[in-house]
């Protein structure tokens, strides 16, 4: 209950700040909205040139990429600054301030990293998703349920990646390349899995299940998933548990500015 109370308060503060500096917020919304259009524009150019991904129409690929954008943006809104906040405190030797707070350090970091600046990405994702859904045939009602289940699992994967990258910053202090690693890993979830070699498919499904971020939810909505998608969702729960445990372990290894 303490976490939810703190998170609610932090959301209110973040929203109040966005309202107070509304011009900056609006500009940020526009920039992030336009930035999220880059990926579908690339797909549009590919299909416009007469090429494409075998077995997938443009609107089906757009469905994958829009679900990927929504999942990524939602996670970034809720805790997107967790990696940078952790990196900052570790680099400056001020993580003791977090440890002195009367709540779990991980819960505190999550509660204080709500980021309205990513609302533009989220809005763009929903616009693209609506446009894609208008042009495709949903397989069935059960397909919608399966899509939602796999979508939630995809968010769990996103959270796990952020936790692991943030945990790594305790070891590799001040390494600004860590967030880039996260983005590179996530990118495998925004394309049809069939375009990758078998080894990459296995890794992206059952080791670091990034296919859940965009591909598997879209495939479920189209009625193209098998049992492997739900097996991947089970792996996502284990991946999340690993991320939480790793972050907590790295906190215990933190030595502070004088370490």
PLM features: residue spans?
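Hydrophobic transmembrane alpha-helices and immediately adjacent juxtamembrane helices
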Residues: 1-137, 141-259
């Amino acid at each position: 209950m303490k976490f939810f109370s703190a998170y609610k308060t932090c959301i209110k503060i973040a929203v109040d700040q966005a309202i107070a500096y509304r011009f900056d917020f609006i500009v940020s919304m526009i920039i992030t909205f336009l930035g999220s259009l880059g990926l579908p524009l690339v797909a549009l150019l590919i299909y416009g040139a007469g090429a494409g991904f075998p077995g997938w129409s443009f609107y089906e690929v757009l469905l994958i990429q829009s679900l990927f954008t929504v999942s990524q943006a939602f996670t970034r809104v809720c805790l997107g600054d967790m990696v940078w906040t952790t990196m900052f405190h570790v680099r400056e030797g001020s993580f003791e301030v977090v440890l002195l707070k009367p709540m779990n350090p991980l819960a505190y970091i999550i509660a204080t990293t709500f980021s309205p600046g990513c609302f533009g990405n989220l809005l763009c994702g929903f616009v693209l998703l609506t446009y894609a859904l208008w042009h495709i045939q949903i397989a069935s009602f059960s397909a919608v349920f399966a899509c939602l289940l796999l979508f939630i699992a995809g968010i769990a994967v996103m959270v796990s990646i952020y936790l692991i990258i943030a945990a790594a910053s305790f070891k590799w202090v001040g390494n600004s390349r860590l967030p880039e690693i996260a983005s590179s890993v996530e990118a495998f979830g925004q394309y049809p899995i069939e375009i990758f070699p078998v080894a990459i498919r296995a890794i992206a499904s059952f080791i670091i299940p990034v296919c859940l971020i965009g591909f598997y939810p879209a495939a479920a909505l189209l009625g193209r998933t098998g049992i492997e998608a739900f097996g991947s969702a089970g792996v996502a729960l284990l991946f999340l548990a690993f991320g939480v445990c790793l972050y907590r372990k790295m906190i215990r290894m933190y030595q502070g500015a004088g370490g």
